[in-house]
C-alpha cells in the first residue's frame, strides 16, 4: 500500500509551497488508494506556536485534503526516540562525543585556513579513555567512512554521495533532545512511509537519513524532491509575491479548488490541460511526472482559475460563501438574477461581494471622472425623460428584458445612441462606469429604487 505524509513544523503558518508539497503527497496516496498521514514536527519547544498548529489544521480542512488516522505529534514521541538512541549506543553504531563548542570552533577555523571542507573529525568515534569532566556529551551516529550513499530520486534521478561527505552527525544534543534528521527517519519508517515527497531543500538531508535507516535496519522509502516555486522573475518567492499563509488566500476571496488547481500545475502537467477538478487530479497525478525545474508563480493565472471556478459555482453555494465577505443575499428575492449578473465580473469573492454591494447599495457619491464623462450635454434631459417613461410604462417591469425595452424606446424616440442613455444611467445607478448591465441592475433593484437613484443623480447635474 502507498503511504505518504506531510510533516509541517508549527513554528509558522502553512505557506503555498508547503501546501503544494502536501497536495502532491495527498494526490499520490489517493491515486493509489493508499494513506496520507499528517505529522506535526513540534520538537522545537521554544519556537512552537499553538496558533500556527491550529492554522495548519484549518488550512487542510479548508482545502478539503483529509488525512488518514490521527495526527502524529513528534513532541509526544521522545521516549520512542530515546529507545532508538540507546539501541544504537548499545550496538556500537553511535557514541558519545565530548567535544566542546570551543574545540569544534577551533577545528572549523583550522579546516577553513587549510581550505578544507568543515566537518567533525571523528575524534571520539573510537574513544575508550576517561571522559573529560564537566562536559555533557552529544550522541553521534557512526556514518560509513568509505563507499557511496546512493538512492534514486523520483524527480532528480540517481543520486550518489561519497560516504566521506557525510560526517558522524549528531543524533541527540547534550540535553538529550533528538535532532531533526534522526527523528524524521524514525518516524517515516515507523509510520510505514513508502513515498516521501518534499521540497528539494531537503535533498541533502536524505543521505543522513539513509544512514539512520541503515543503522536501524529500516526499509528506505522512495524519495521525490520537488523544485521550489519562484516568483514571476524566476527568483525566490517572497511574501510580497504570494508566499503567504494559505488562509490569507481564503481571506482574499480565493476558492480552495482554484488554489489546488493552480498549485498542481506548478511543477506538474498532463498534456495541455489547465483546468483540473480534484477528481481529475487524483485520477491523473503521478509523482514521476513532477518537473525537475522550478516553477514560476503567476498571480494572473491564479485569478483566471479563480474566476472560472466562481463562474461555475451554483448560486446557492456562492450565496453561502459570500456571507463571510459581508454580503448576505440568501433570502433576497432576486438572488439568482443578482448572481447571474455579477459572478462573471468577480475574479475573487471579495470582488464579487463588492459588485453586489455596488448594486444593492445606492451610491452616496459619484466617481469624479465618470461624472465628467457621463453627466454632460443632454444627460440631464435624457435621464429626466427616462424617469417619466418608467413612471408611465404600462407593461410589467420585472425582468432585464423589460427594462431593456424601455431603454430601446428612449433611444428610438430621442434618436440617440445607446451610450447617451447608458453612461449617465450607469453612473446614476452605481456611482461609477463599471459594474453589471443596466437592464440587470434595474431589474434587481426594482422600478421605485431605480427612479429614486436617477432622481438623486439628476439633482446633482448643473
Swiss-Prot record:
Top class in the EC scheme: ligase
Binding-site list for ATP: 239
Motif position, 'KMSKS' region: 236-240
GO cellular component: cytosol
Pfam assignment, any one: tRNA-synt_1c
Disulfide bond annotation, renumbered to this chain: none
EC number: 6.1.1.17
Sequence motif 'HIGH' region, residues: 8-18
GO BP of this protein: glutamyl-tRNA aminoacylation
Record's signal peptide: none
Predominant location category: cytoplasm
Keywords: Aminoacyl-tRNA synthetase, ATP-binding, Cytoplasm, Ligase, Nucleotide-binding, Protein biosynthesis
Reaction catalysis annotation: tRNA(Glu) + L-glutamate + ATP = L-glutamyl-tRNA(Glu) + AMP + diphosphate
Subcellular location: Cytoplasm
PROSITE patterns registered for this protein in UniProt: AA_TRNA_LIGASE_I
Function: Catalyzes the attachment of glutamate to tRNA(Glu) in a two-step reaction: glutamate is first activated by ATP to form Glu-AMP and then transferred to the acceptor end of tRNA(Glu).
Family according to the record: Belongs to the class-I aminoacyl-tRNA synthetase family. Glutamate--tRNA ligase type 1 subfamily.
Cross-referenced PANTHER family: GLUTAMATE--TRNA LIGASE, GLUTAMATE--TRNA LIGASE, MITOCHONDRIAL-RELATED
Name of the protein described by the UniProt record: Glutamate--tRNA ligase 1
Gene that specifies this protein: gltX1
Amino acid at each position: 500500500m502507498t503511504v505518504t505524509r506531510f510533516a509541517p513544523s508549527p513554528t509558522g503558518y502553512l505557506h503555498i509551497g508547503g501546501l503544494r508539497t502536501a497536495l502532491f503527497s495527498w494526490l499520490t496516496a489517493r491515486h493509489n488508494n493508499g494513506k496520507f498521514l499528517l505529522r506535526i514536527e513540534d520538537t522545537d519547544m521554544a519556537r512552537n506556536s499553538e496558533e500556527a498548529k491550529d492554522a495548519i489544521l484549518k488550512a487542510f480542512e479548508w482545502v478539503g485534503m483529509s488525512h488518514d488516522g490521527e495526527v502524529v505529534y513528534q513532541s509526544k514521541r521522545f521516549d520512542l526516540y530515546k529507545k532508538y538512541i540507546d539501541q544504537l549506543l548499545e550496538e556500537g553504531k553511535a557514541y558519545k562525543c565530548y567535544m566542546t563548542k570551543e574545540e569544534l570552533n577551533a577545528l572549523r577555523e583550522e579546516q577553513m585556513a587549510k581550505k578544507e571542507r568543515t566537518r567533525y573529525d571523528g575524534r571520539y568515534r573510537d574513544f575508550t579513555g576517561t571522559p573529560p569532566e564537566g562536559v555533557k556529551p552529544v550522541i553521534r551516529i557512526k556514518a560509513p567512512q568509505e563507499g557511496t550513499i546512493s538512492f534514486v530520486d523520483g524527480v532528480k534521478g540517481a543520486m550518489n554521495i561519497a560516504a566521506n561527505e557525510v560526517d558522524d552527525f549528531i543524533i541527540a544534543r547534550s540535553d538529550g533532545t533528538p535532532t531533526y534528521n534522526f527523528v524524521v527517519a524514525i518516524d517515516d519508517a515507523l509510520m510505514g512511509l513508502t513515498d516521501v515527497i518534499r521540497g528539494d531543500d531537503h535533498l541533502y538531508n536524505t543521505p543522513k537519513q539513509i544512514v539512520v535507516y541503515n543503522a536501524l535496519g529500516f526499509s528506505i522509502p522512495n524519495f521525490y524532491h520537488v523544485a521550489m516555486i519562484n516568483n514571476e522573475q524566476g527568483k525566490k518567492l517572497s511574501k510580497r509575491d504570494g508566499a503567504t499563509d494559505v488562509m490569507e488566500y481564503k481571506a482574499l476571496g480565493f476558492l480552495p479548488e482554484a488554489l489546488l488547481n493552480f498549485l498542481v500545475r506548478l511543477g506538474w502537467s498532463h498534456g495541455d490541460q489547465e483546468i483540473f477538478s480534484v477528481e481529475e487530479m487524483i485520477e491523473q497525478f503521478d509523482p514521476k511526472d513532477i518537473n525537475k525545474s522550478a516553477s514560476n508563480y503567476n498571480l494572473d493565472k491564479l485569478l483566471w482559475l479563480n474566476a472560472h471556478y466562481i463562474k461555475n459555482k451554483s448560486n446557492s453555494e456562492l450565496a453561502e460563501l459570500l456571507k463571510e465577505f459581508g454580503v448576505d443575499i440568501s433570502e433576497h428575492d432576486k438572488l439568482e438574477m443578482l448572481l447571474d449578473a455579477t459572478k462573471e465580473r468577480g475574479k475573487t469573492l471579495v470582488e464579487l461581494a463588492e459588485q453586489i454591494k455596488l448594486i444593492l447599495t445606492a451610491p452616496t457619491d459619484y466617481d469624479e471622472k465618470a461624472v465628467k464623462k457621463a453627466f454632460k450635454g443632454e444627460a440631464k434631459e435624457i435621464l429626466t425623460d427616462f424617469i417619466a417613461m418608467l413612471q408611465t410604462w404600462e407593461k410589467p417591469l420585472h425582468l432585464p428584458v423589460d427594462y431593456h425595452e424601455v431603454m430601446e424606446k428612449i433611444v428610438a424616440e430621442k434618436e440617440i445612441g445607446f451610450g447617451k442613455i447608458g453612461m449617465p444611467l450607469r453612473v446614476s445607478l452605481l456611482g461609477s462606469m463599471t459594474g453589471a448591465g443596466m437592464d440587470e441592475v434595474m431589474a434587481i433593484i426594482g422600478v421605485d429604487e431605480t427612479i429614486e437613484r436617477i432622481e438623486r443623480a439628476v439633482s446633482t447635474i448643473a
